[in-house]
From Swiss-Prot:
Keywords: Cytoplasm, Hydrolase, Metal-binding, Nucleotide-binding. One of its GO terms (cellular component) is cytoplasm. It holds the Pfam family SurE. Binds 1 divalent metal cation per subunit. It is found in: Cytoplasm. A divalent metal cation binds at residues 8-9, 39, 91. This is 5'-nucleotidase SurE. Disulfide bonds: none annotated. The lineage of its organism: Bacteria, Pseudomonadati, Spirochaetota, Spirochaetia, Leptospirales. It comes from Leptospira borgpetersenii serovar Hardjo-bovis (strain JB197). Its main location: cytoplasm. It comes from the Bacteria. One of its GO terms (molecular function) is exopolyphosphatase activity.
Length: 250
């Protein structure tokens, strides 16, 4: 299988190195990643600016752009053979609930899904400094080898692995997205007149406790796998909204 590996933590991150080290033993891996940290960039693309792309060797490229840029160049830049699977991660920190709308990790995988590739985003709850993520990568390899034939194109499979996990498929749970809440704080530095610099000082993160969600699985020590559709239409409201507007216009 031809696997494009990318992330939003940058080319030097331990998570992407672990995926490549483990997967290249049995698959053809092609690594293309941002030059620097690009967290919370979702599916941003560089459409007005050129991007500097550096070829390290035949299968390694660095892009001065966003994670979705990396996927786009990997798929359409005539540098790799046809890619079967877009694999994004392993992210240092989880992406669950509403996180998925901001995440560059998930955004990169979603871009693969837009272009009809199998797409998997992987995040870890282990944010220990200098951790190597090899155990997580081995689990991902096992999952791909066992189940990739059952996955569908046009779907993003979002996997979150707890800090202390049992590396067994019996520990995997298929989940839905939970509800994340954010309480953001900013610091401000006044420059001159009405000009000021704002810095996101941090976010207090909470989540709802509900059965069947990624949060519930994760915090009970299970590995969550959530299938994410590209179609974000709220089907339940389509007819209701149509009927409501029709009545108001009649």
């Amino acid at each position: 299988m031809n696997i494009l590996i990318t992330n939003d933590d940058g080319i030097a991150s331990s998570g992407i190195k672990a995926l490549e080290a483990v997967l290249q033993k049995e698959h053809d891996t092609f690594l293309i990643a941002p030059l620097r940290e690009r967290s919370a960039t979702s599916m941003a693309l560089s459409i007005y600016d050129s991007m500097r792309v550096e070829r390290i060797n035949d299968n390694h490229y660095i892009v001065d752009g966003y994670p979705a840029d990396c996927v786009n160049i990997g798929l359409h830049g005539d540098i790799f053979p046809r890619i079967d699977l877009v694999l994004s991660g392993i992210n240092r920190g989880v992406n669950m609930g509403h996180d998925i709308h901001y995440s560059g990790t998930v955004g990169a995988a979603r871009h693969g899904a837009v272009h009809s590739r199998l797409s998997l985003a992987v995040s870890s709850g282990n944010i220990t400094k200098d951790y190597d993520y090899i155990r997580e990568a081995e689990f991902v390899r096992h999952f791909i080898d066992e189940y990739s034939s059952l996955l569908k194109v046009g779907v993003v499979y979002n996997m979150n692995i707890p800090f202390d996990f049992v590396s067994s498929m019996e520990n995997l749970r298929i989940t839905r997205l939970g509800k994340r809440t954010y309480e953001d704080t900013y610091s401000k530095k006044n420059i001159i007149g009405g000009i000021a610099d704002f810095y996101l000082g941090g976010s207090k993160l909470e989540h709802a406790t509900e059965e069947g969600t990624d949060f519930t699985a994760f915090f009970s020590g299970k590995i969550s796998l959530t299938p994410l559709s590209l179609d974000q239409t709220d089907i339940s409201l389509v007819q209701e909204l149509s009927d409501t507007l029709s009545k108001s216009l009649s």
